[in-house]
Amino acid sequence: MKQVVLNIVIAFLWVLFQDEDEFKFTTFFAGFLIGLIVIYILHRFFGEEFYLKKIWVAIKFLAVYLYQLITSSISTINYILFKTNEVNPGLLTYETSLKSNWAITFLTILIIITPGSTVIRISKNTNKFFIHSIDVSEKDKENLLKSIKQYEDLILEVTR
């Protein structure tokens, strides 16, 4: 957060020194880019990672989630319309390595929002998720656990 504020301050200072008459967005943008370069060079002294890395991870996270949402929606629609007799609902467990409550809650929300699965319970001691899935055949079970692991890895990457 400090890096973002500092970058905006550098951009405004750049505008003040360059454009004395009026505010120009192009000058602000140039100052913002100069601020990015300065902060990238000095980010080791902040004791934090360069802030654009987290923004990139958030964009990557959004892309992965949208892909998972679309594919699981298509799969669920396929089960509802064409494979009603082949549905094999059931429970499965997933143990997470997430420690903070908000990260576990966020993972729970991602699982619930994704069609075809919902979290029934979370064990307090072991952080084990009990998940109901529309199909627990080996292939679909592996796909669901793989997507949950992918969500978990991205949450860990964002929170580092």
From Swiss-Prot:
GO cellular component terms, A-Z: plasma membrane
Transmembrane spans: 23-43, 55-75, 100-120
The entry's keywords: Antiport, Cell membrane, Ion transport, Membrane, Transmembrane, Transmembrane helix, Transport
Subcellular localization(s) per the UniProt record: Cell membrane
Membrane association type: Multi-pass membrane protein
GO terms of molecular function: antiporter activity; monoatomic cation transmembrane transporter activity
Record keyword Ion transport present: yes
Cross-referenced Pfam families: MNHE
PANTHER family xrefs: NA(+)/H(+) ANTIPORTER SUBUNIT E1, NA(+)_H(+) ANTIPORTER SUBUNIT E1
NCBIfam families: PRK08965.1-1 (NF006517)
Family from the record: Belongs to the CPA3 antiporters (TC 2.A.63) subunit E family.
Subunit: May form a heterooligomeric complex that consists of seven subunits: mnhA2, mnhB2, mnhC2, mnhD2, mnhE2, mnhF2 and mnhG2.
Protein name per the record: Putative antiporter subunit mnhE2
Species, as recorded: Staphylococcus epidermidis (strain ATCC 35984 / DSM 28319 / BCRC 17069 / CCUG 31568 / BM 3577 / RP62A)
